[in-house]
Amino acid sequence: LTTVISYFALVAFALVGVSYATPKASINGRIVGGEMTDISLIPYQVSVQTAISSYGFIHHCGGSIISPRWVVTAAHCAQKTNSAYQVYTGSSNKVEGGQAYRVKTIINHPLYDEETTDYDVALLELAEPIVMNYKTAAIELAEVGEEVETDAMAIVSGWGDTKNFGEEPNMLRSAEVPIFDQELCAYLNANHGVVTERMICAGYLAGGRDSCQGDSGGPLAVDGKLVGIVSWGVGCAQSNFPGVYGI
C-alpha cells in the first residue's frame, strides 16, 4: 500500500477561509506511449504557462484545478514571481481555444527542497475565478491518510514530450499507468534520486508509458481523485525507472 499524506495538507492550509462565491538537470520533470485525449475527459487539467520576453506566454508545466481560484502544480514549476505565469484552461490545445488566467499568488511548500525534489508541490491562486463548465472542473483530492493500492490504474496527462527530447505536442495526451511498488521504486531509482514518503511512483517495469518533459506539475489520478503531481524520473518511459510523483 502507498499512503497519500503530504500535499493535501498544504492544500487544506491554503484554502482555509477561501470561498467558492526545476528538478536536478539529470532528472526531468516529465506522455509517452499514451494517446490524444479531449479536455472534456480531463477537465481539471491546465497548462501552466510562463512569459518569454516578446513571445508572450508558452507552455511550461501542467497543473490541476482544485477550486475556481486555485490550481495545484509542482514547486519546481513555480520558482519565479507570480507575474511570470498564467494558467490556460478549457482546451485540448495548449495554444488556442482556451481561457488564460493571471496568477495572483504562488505558495510553494515551505519544505520544498530543490536538490532532492522533496515536497514538490505549489499552489497558484488566480486573479479571477475560473468559469466552470464541462471543459473546466475541479478534481477531488484524495484525503490525508488515504491509501492507494499498488497496481491500481492511474491516469497521467499533459502536453509534454511524446518521447525523449522529442517534439512537444500541442494536443493533450493521456496514458494509463499502474501505481508502482514504493520500495522497489526507491531501490531502482537509488542512484538517481531519493524516493521519499512524500512521493508515489507509477509506471511499468518494462517501460513504454510515462509522463515526460513538459508534463511536470500535472495530475496523476486514480478513480477520479488526484493522488500525485508529476515530479521527476529518469528519462521517459524507460524500463526499470517508473515515474515519480509528489504527494
UniProtKB/Swiss-Prot annotation:
It catalyses: Preferential cleavage: Arg-|-Xaa, Lys-|-Xaa. GO terms for cellular component: extracellular region. Midgut. Its main location: secreted. The record marks 210 as: Required for specificity. Disulfide bonds join 61-77, 185-201, 212-236. Keywords: Disulfide bond, Hydrolase, Protease, Secreted, Serine protease, Signal, Zymogen. Its EC number is 3.4.21.4. PROSITE patterns: TRYPSIN_DOM (PS50240), TRYPSIN_HIS (PS00134), TRYPSIN_SER (PS00135). Residues 1-21 form the signal peptide. Residues 22-30 form a propeptide. It is found in: Secreted, Extracellular space. Residues 31-247 form the Peptidase S1 domain. It comes from the Eukaryota. GO terms for molecular function: serine-type endopeptidase activity. The keyword Hydrolase applies. The active site is at 76 (charge relay system), 120 (charge relay system), 216 (charge relay system). The keyword Disulfide bond applies. It is an enzyme of class 3 (hydrolase). One of its GO terms (biological process) is proteolysis. PANTHER family: ACROSIN-RELATED, HYALIN. Belongs to the peptidase S1 family. This is Trypsin. The lineage of its organism: Eukaryota, Metazoa, Ecdysozoa, Arthropoda, Hexapoda.
